[in-house]
Amino acid sequence: MLNTIYRLTEPRKIEVEFNDMPVNDDQVIVRPTHLSICNADQRYYQGTRDPEVLAKKLPMALIHEGVGIVARDACGQFKAGDPVVMIPNTPFEEDPFIAENYLRSSKFRASGFDGFMQDNVAMRRDRVIRLPETIDREVAAFIEIISVSNHAIDRFDRFSHGRKDHIAVWGDGNLAFITSLLLRHRY
């Protein structure tokens, strides 16, 4: 399948590359429709990451937060046109003690492994979640960062005492704002 990838080749320079994407029946092909730019993407683009990191990871398609529509699923679990969220972490092993996002063998999109700035993204079936039709796609593009906030709040719940009349969140970015919204909703 012919695919177009938009790769950052050096700070502030994105080049278009065309390649033949192998189509595996175990994968779902997703066409990204709404993407969210993370601070990590900005640091790669602006060249504010360490030069050694840039040299090691570029060229690379950016963006690890996004939703899209299914273009192809040979197994039929998803229909063409189904709205889905793409999970950027790709684990290759299971560990009873270490969460998949902390395993050294896992690959994370847009961190040394092409992200979602492509016309089509081949995703493992377990890395795709169908979205309800009622969810606004612009909001859904933030599901990955919302999951980060939710994970932090779940840990907070496990290790904090029961008195939660007042909770403070330090930070002035999207993650702090979303975490504050979720905390307010939960408590």
PLM feature spans:
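Glycine-rich beta-strand-centered segment in the early N-terminal region that forms part
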Residues: 23-35, 50-93, 132-134
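Mid-domain Rossmann-like dinucleotide-binding core that forms the NAD(H)/NADP(H) cofactor-binding site
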Residues: 135-187
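Extreme N-terminal starter segment of soluble prokaryotic enzymes
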Residues: 1-4
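Glycine/charged-rich beta-loop-alpha catalytic/anionic-binding loops adjacent to active sites
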Residues: 127-137
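Short Gly/aromatic-enriched secondary-structure transition segments
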Residues: 44-49
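Cysteine-cluster motifs in flexible loop/terminal segments that predominantly coordinate metals
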Residues: 38, 88-129
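Residue-level recognition of beta-strand termini and adjacent short loop/turns
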Residues: 9-10, 24
